From Swiss-Prot:
SUPFAM superfamilies: SurE-like
Record's keyword annotation contains Flavoprotein: no
Annotated source species: Prochlorococcus marinus (strain MIT 9313)
PANTHER family in the record: 5'-NUCLEOTIDASE SURE, 5'_3'-NUCLEOTIDASE SURE
UniProt-annotated binding residues for a divalent metal cation: 11-12, 43, 101
Molecular-function GO term, any one: exopolyphosphatase activity
Cofactors demanded by this protein: a divalent metal cation
Protein name: 5'-nucleotidase SurE
Reactions catalysed: a ribonucleoside 5'-phosphate + H2O = a ribonucleoside + phosphate
GO cellular component entries: cytoplasm
Subcellular location: Cytoplasm
Chief place where the protein resides: cytoplasm
Domain of life from the UniProt record: Bacteria
Length: 269
């Protein structure tokens, strides 16, 4: 394959082992790699942007191996990709990668994910983009995930990568020889039991820690072919899931079921 110009970001921060493994995997295949990541952990920030404070970026090539340019950015994951595309890169990249995330990005959790948001920023700019996550917060071997992410991205580019397609790849927490086959999957609908831990600081002010737990994954919910498993079900078989996502959130249900009263009897202007 012709060497690619690849932009890599994440939400775990520029020091995270997952993104360093992904950058090394891409560089080892001869690609030109630029990493632009938050300067600290920014997980679950979704597609948030920094608009009330300045964004700062500094070169940190020494944190990465040969052939990798790296920047540490004070902004969110989406900020990182925006800044890279507008200011830091000399040329438009061929591919945007985000990850490898330290934990899953499954089902409707993608709405909260900084990892997916960084990739989505690439998609919104008309670029092929892939988000990759290891579906366990404790797992720390990112080599298989990094190599599989590169395989998927290179194969997709060599075949056909449609416009507005974001690929969301989740890898089970196991070694390659124990892993099942990669399959296309649907996005599951995840329901949480929201729990907040109430605490009091030394100044007698109350504060809270969010500690919700998944209580239900709706296997039959969501769009997509019925013969595709959900991403959650696929991971539970120790097999990687690959879910196609797009930025268009327009409702695909029965339009006749929309509450007509919302737009009825509006005054003429």
């Amino acid at each position: 394959m012709t060497p690619l110009q690849i932009l890599i970001s994440n939400d775990d921060g520029v020091l995270a082992e997952g993104v360093r493994c992904l950058a090394a995997a891409a560089a080892s295949r001869g690609h030109r790699v630029t990493v632009v990541c938050p300067d600290h952990e920014r997980s679950a920030t979704g597609h948030g942007l920094t608009i009330h404070t300045p964004i700062r970026a500094e070169r940190v090539d020494e944190l990465y191996g040969p052939g990798v340019k790296a920047w540490s950015c004070s902004g969110t994951p989406a900020d990182c990709v925006k800044l890279a595309l507008s200011e830091l890169l000399a040329e438009k990249p061929d591919l945007v990668l985000s990850g490898v995330n330290h934990g899953p990005n499954l089902g409707t959790d993608v709405f909260c994910s900084g990892t997916v948001a960084a990739a989505m920023e690439g998609t919104l700019e008309g670029l092929p983009a892939l988000a990759v996550s290891v579906a366990c917060f404790q797992w720390r071997d990112f080599q298989a995930a990094a190599q599989l992410a590169m395989d998927v991205a290179e194969n997709a580019l060599a075949d056909h990568w449609p416009n507005n397609l974001l690929l969301n790849l989740n890898i089970p927490p196991c070694h390659l020889e124990q892993m099942g086959s990669l399959r296309w999957t649907r996005l599951s609908i995840r329901h949480y039991e929201e729990q907040f831990s109430r605490r009091v600081d030394p100044h007698s002010r109350t504060y809270f820690w969010l500690a919700g737990e998944v209580v239900k994954d709706l296997e039959t919910a969501g769009d997509g072919p019925r013969d595709w498993p959900s991403d959650v079900a696929q991971i539970e078989t120790n097999s990687p899931s690959l879910t196609p996502i797009q930025p268009d959130l327009f409702w695909r249900g029965d339009l006749s079921a929309l509450p007509a009263a919302c737009v009825a009897n509006q005054p003429v202007r």
